[in-house]
Amino acid sequence: MTVTQVQSGVPNLTYQVSWEIPEDHSLLDEPVENTSQPLLAAALRESLELIGFLTPERLVASNLGICATVNGKTIVKASDWLYAPRVLPLDPPRARRSYTPRVEGDIPAVVMEFLSETDGGEYSARPFYPYGKFWFYERILQAPLYVILEPEGGTLEMRQLAEGIYQVQQPEANGRYWIASMALYLGVWHGTKAERTGYWLRWWDENENLLLWGIERLEQERQRAERLESYLRSQGIDPDEIP
């Protein structure tokens, strides 16, 4: 068990944080607040999977409870999306129902929230149990990057931990944010995927190439095949007769 003392920034308030979950603790499932949240999270994961970014040693998850014990009380906060660079792999067919940093792997390098139309808890800095999400990520978890997307208007905010406090970051000239721990850019893209039309979070590589979804790759291949067929016919070759 790892125990750390954390200064809260509030006078006379210190946290004792331990990274071990009691055996009898029952995880509470946080409901997904709207249909856009799982679609946004799945789209982020899909393009990473297609480039081979996902490995058993890396954790990319959505709506997964991040666990800590603070002053003897167990805290579970489910982020809409998270990335941890190194974790202890689970033996199949076990599924990960929660994640306890330091015990099961690294502190998440990136945590994300997609704003809902409810109480705006993603910005909550409540320093007392059960703690606001913003406060939990900044002071207790101390995740290096906290990303917030407002899906309706496409507003993207990124905060980086500096001396224990989140500082708002400015996008680069291309309008995107460089995430060094993933060697990728993160930005906003507007379009349609599945049944949803609107703003999406997308990845770009270091050369600013958009990481495509599966359906986009298929369309790219279809267009390439059409161009090849057109070229062959222009040369007097019938593609259907090529063995």
Model-found features: residue ranges?
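C-terminal interaction segment
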Residues: 2-33, 50, 68-73, 84-110, ...
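Acidic-basic catalytic patches of nuclease active cores, encompassing PD-(D/E)XK
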Residues: 32-62, 69-82
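A structural signal for short, well-ordered beta-strand segments and their strand-loop junctions
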Residues: 59-61, 147-150
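Short, surface-exposed beta-edge/turn micro-motifs
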Residues: 79, 143-145
